[in-house]
Amino acid sequence: MPVKGFKPYSPGRRQMTVSTFEEITKTTPERSLLAPLKSKAGRNNQGKLTVRHQGGGHKRKYRLIDFKRNKDSVPAKVASIEYDPNRSANIALLHYLDGHKAYILAPNGLQVGQMVVSGPDADIKVGNALPIKNIPVGTLLHNIEMKPGKGAQLVRSAGGSAQLMAKEGKYATLRLPSGEMRMVHIDCRATIGQVGNLEHENINIGKAGRSRWLGIRPTVRGAVMNPNDHPHGGGEGRNPIGRNPVTPWGKPALGAKTRKKKHPSNRFIVKRRGKK
């Protein structure tokens, strides 16, 4: 969706950009596919803070998205393209010919009235979902499973696409948006095409309050805290850190690697992602 700016009639409007929502065809969601979504504000089931800088924001309902795409050989008509406040991509409402309704991630180029289908015999067409073993090498994919039948976990955000690079034995090699080359089982399902809403990356928040609408709270630097609040804090005026950068709890930060050296999925990674 194209992005529009504003005349600078206030400091907050000067840099702000918003989506024009031209692709959105329906503004009220399908009630049968909504679920309540309680605000966690970064707390776990014990009420303890586990993720900082979260809280507040507009109240939301969760849209139940079909990430498995396992309703085989039943064609579905795209009834509408809708906004989803819980993700960067838009979603498409499908009406299956047997009366079932479902939401899927809206791929780039998907139009209202278009027919999509899932299953091993599906055509290589945008919006269709099928096992990777039935997809030709070089195809752009999104909504990719990591384990057969578990549901899609990879390449789900706006504008994302992976390319099928090779198929050998039981595994296929994908090039992910990060540049990582990764193997997945050929029985895993993927959807043809690129995730829509390509211009999402060009949106400028513009002002602090808009971040608060999204449930994002301020990030305070440790250097401006008191020494009892952060290892970087204290001192008269501005000071260098004076030690290796650390988190509020004293663990290495700012470039320290956090991935486990013996992560179970290491054997599926052919090439690590490059530095940005």
Curated annotation (Swiss-Prot):
Cellular component aspect of the GO annotation: large ribosomal subunit
Gene Ontology molecular functions: rRNA binding; structural constituent of ribosome; transferase activity
Claim: Ribonucleoprotein is one of the keywords in the record: yes
UniProt xrefs under PROSITE patterns: RIBOSOMAL_L2
GO biological process: one example: cytoplasmic translation
Compositional bias segments (type: Basic residues): 257-276
Keywords: Ribonucleoprotein, Ribosomal protein, RNA-binding, rRNA-binding
Pfam families: Ribosomal_L2 (PF00181), Ribosomal_L2_C (PF03947)
Cited PANTHER family: LARGE RIBOSOMAL SUBUNIT PROTEIN UL2M, RIBOSOMAL PROTEIN L2
Family to which this protein belongs: Belongs to the universal ribosomal protein uL2 family.
Record's function text: One of the primary rRNA binding proteins. Required for association of the 30S and 50S subunits to form the 70S ribosome, for tRNA binding and peptide bond formation. It has been suggested to have peptidyltransferase activity; this is somewhat controversial. Makes several contacts with the 16S rRNA in the 70S ribosome.
Oligomer status and interactors: Part of the 50S ribosomal subunit. Forms a bridge to the 30S subunit in the 70S ribosome.
Protein name in UniProt: Large ribosomal subunit protein uL2
Species in which this protein is naturally found: Desulfitobacterium hafniense (strain Y51)
Gene: rplB
